[in-house]
């Protein structure tokens, strides 16, 4: 790949620090920063279906899916996008890939990871965090996210990178380095 990557998807399990890292990164790149969940909430609000994330996730799955599709179509119309999303969500029925690969084809998929224990601590400290998992189920979720993003990458022809989030500033710089390497066409390990 050579040239500025048009779409960069930063994915990770809830509590891994995606939003913090993406907000820092958005000040370093020309891409428009989009938090997928916030965009879905905006769409739901415009359609008079939900005003809070809690309301959004109480909607029937078919309505959530329509909102998810509308958000994807809005993102697809943008030129340079930095997307912040989970990539894989856990539901009562199992896992759902939340990267809309039929509509958006990221040039780069960055899987942001943190130590699972740190993620659990962040989740407990965040009163808005609705996801509750055991350490074992969190590790499974992280592994399933990796697997699903590599499958998406194979289907889309995207590059996948894994970045550890020990420090948000450093993680943002690591992702910036990946974007710059793609821009330069550098695919050497």
Curated annotation (Swiss-Prot):
Q: Which Pfam families match?
A: AAA_17 (PF13207)
Whether Hydrolase counts among this entry's keywords is: no
Gene3D superfamilies in UniProt: P-loop containing nucleotide triphosphate hydrolases
GO molecular function, a single term? ATP binding
* Keyword entries, A-Z: ATP-binding, Kinase, Nucleotide-binding, Transferase
Record: residues binding ATP:
12-20
Give the family per the record.
Answer: Belongs to the archaeal adenylate kinase family.
What is the recorded name of this protein? Adenylate kinase homolog MTH_1663
Organism annotation = Methanothermobacter thermautotrophicus (strain ATCC 29096 / DSM 1053 / JCM 10044 / NBRC 100330 / Delta H) (Methanobacterium thermoautotrophicum)
